[in-house]
Amino acid sequence: LFSAHYYGLGYYMHGLQSQPAALTPAQEKCEKFMTLVAENFKTQREIGFYADKLCVTGKYLSTMLKQETGMTALDWIERHVVLYAKSCLSSTSMTIQEISDELDFPSQSVFGKYFKRVEGMSPKAYRQSLSKD
């Protein structure tokens, strides 16, 4: 499941690599952003962190990503965080608290609310849904 996490990134990157011309500045920024997210999503969920690293504003970063990929910066960050959490929930015996700690959330409650907002169900409900399949 966690490999699905990179499907969107891989699909986008394949599109960039198959283009004969050099990358546009926006495409280069997208590539750098995705690399930064893959390296930092466990501890950095703020758009400002990534925008600062890329020397752009958060608004510009999100607009550029939306134009290039169809997803905003926050969408990409949340996708990485939640897909990693789903992978842990489905393929490890880690507790929800341990996953919350691994992803640097201030509490299990905050993690649960984040997961539910993005995924539409709590981490516990997600794990239980896996055992029904």
List each model region and its residues:
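…primarily DNA-binding HTH/wHTH and HhH modules…
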Residues: 113-133
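Short, Lys/Arg-enriched, Trp-marked, Pro/Gly-tolerant hinge/linker segments that flank
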Residues: 10-35, 39-53, 67-75, 79
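Residues within the alpha-helical elements of helix-turn-helix
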Residues: 53, 102-103, 118
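Short hydrophobic/aromatic patch on the recognition helix
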Residues: 61-62, 110-111, 115
